[in-house]
Swiss-Prot record:
Succinyl-CoA synthetase functions in the citric acid cycle (TCA), coupling the hydrolysis of succinyl-CoA to the synthesis of either ATP or GTP and thus represents the only step of substrate-level phosphorylation in the TCA. The beta subunit provides nucleotide specificity of the enzyme and binds the substrate succinate, while the binding sites for coenzyme A and phosphate are found in the alpha subunit. ATP binds at K46, G53, R54, G55, E99, S102, E107. It holds the Pfam family ATP-grasp_2. Its EC number is 6.2.1.5. The keyword Isomerase does not apply. This is Succinate--CoA ligase [ADP-forming] subunit beta. Substrate binds at N264, G321, I322, V323. Heterotetramer of two alpha and two beta subunits.
Length: 388
């Protein structure tokens, strides 16, 4: 689960990290009043969406007057912001962050992520702030400095000092950096984060450190024990189909193809998408119904797939291990009858009760195309999607 910038900064403040004075606003009038409370001559106004590239898309501006701030809010609130990280429809803007402009002398990068290779939280720091860390890693990897956090003892002050030295910080800046580093380390584990970034972490003209931007991603598997963070969830930033799928414990990712896919198991789902591509098709989604699929979940999966108007055919690929193929077949039949499927449906069943599942489908009287193998299924669904 992602957080907005203003929410990330709320957590930063909770751990004593330095942030600019700012206010999250829901209406143009609130933005106007917030601008009046900020003492700096210039105000920064930012659209709050779960995507990067806001500045280049016009979603971040600098204004001298309260009226300018209000006009910006009027322009964007209720609209969609399209950036290079969104799809063509963009992300809806429901909040505007109004904050004081900062006197920036230098920009740094500080982030943390779970490193699966070392099984530790790894902090990354760089003097190349304000740009994408992926670009820095590709072009100048020697400018990224790392510190791995031992899960038994947590972040240590000496690690923060080492990073500060490598960033060229001096005097009181080192103390400030260590405080930020220690606070982020505590926050990462306490709130079950998967990723956090401060980009940029700036050095102001007065020589102080300031968290100018914030990005936080929370491990969704841990949300059950993070009620405070659950309340920060913004469903407006999610694909409606993905949000619906999550309610039914379905793993769904919308894509831009025309072949709907329903599979049990993430690996098989990825393999199914690959073989559809191999035979000239384009998957419309990734959908894993999981090992504990029920008839109800299968029916909901069908509804979600068919809610995409681009879907011209559906491929159901089930390997019966934990889940029984006959139960999946009953779910398919129920969904087809309930939803009124008007596109071709290709079904490949293998494993537990596969023969019984195929028999159930054959006796249903529905126009369902049976496939003997994965290759056969891919060829048939691609042909069906093309109207052949």
């Amino acid at each position: 689960m992602n957080l907005h910038e203003y929410q990330a900064k709320q957590l930063f403040a909770e751990f004593g990290l330095p942030i600019p004075e700012g206010y999250a606003c829901d209406t143009p009038q609130e933005a106007f009043e917030a601008a009046g409370r900020i003492s700096t001559a210039k105000k920064v106004v930012k659209c709050q969406v779960h995507a990067g590239g806001r500045g280049k898309a016009g979603g971040v501006e600098l204004h001298d007057t309260k009226e300018g701030v209000k006009e910006f809010a009027q322009k964007w609130l209720g609209k969609n912001l399209v950036t290079y990280q969104t799809d063509a429809n963009g992300q809806p803007v429901t909040k505007i962050l109004v904050e004081e402009a900062s006197n920036i002398a230098n920009e740094l990068y500080l982030g943390a992520v779970v490193d699966r290779a070392t099984r530790k939280v790894v902090f990354m720091a760089s003097t190349e702030g304000g740009v994408e860390i992926e670009k820095v890693a590709e072009e100048t990897p020697e400018l990224i400095h790392k510190a791995a956090i031992d899960p038994l003892v947590g972040p240590q002050a000496y690690q923060g000092r080492e990073l500060a030295f490598k960033l060229g910080l001096q005097g009181d800046q080192i103390k400030q950096f260590v405080k930020i580093f220690m606070g982020l380390g505590e926050m990462f584990t306490q709130y079950d984060l998967a990723l956090l970034e401060i980009n940029p972490l700036v050095i102001t003209g007065e020589g102080n450190l300031l968290c100018l931007d914030g990005k936080i991603n929370i491990d969704s598997n841990a949300l059950y024990r993070q009620p405070k963070l659950r309340e920060m969830h913004d469903p407006s930033q999610e694909d409606k189909r993905e949000a619906h799928a999550a309610q039914w414990e379905l793993n769904y990712v919308a894509l831009d193809g025309n072949v709907g896919c329903m599979v049990n198991g993430a690996g098989l789902a990825m393999g199914t998408m690959d073989i559809v591509n191999l035979h000239g098709g384009k998957p419309a989604n990734f959908l894993d119904v999981g090992g504990g699929a029920t008839k109800e979940r299968v029916a909901e999966a069908f509804k979600i797939i068919l809610s995409d108007d681009n879907v011209k055919a559906v491929l159901v690929n089930i390997f019966g291990g934990i889940v029984r193929c006959d139960m999946i077949a009953e779910g398919i039949i129920g969904a087809v009858k309930e939803v009124g499927v008007s596109v071709p449906v290709v079904v490949r069943l293998e494993g537990t009760n596969a023969d019984l599942g195929r028999k159930v489908l054959a006796e249903s009287g529905l126009d369902i195309i049976a496939a003997e193998s994965l290759t056969d299924a891919a060829q048939k669904v691609v042909a069906a999607a093309e109207g052949k």
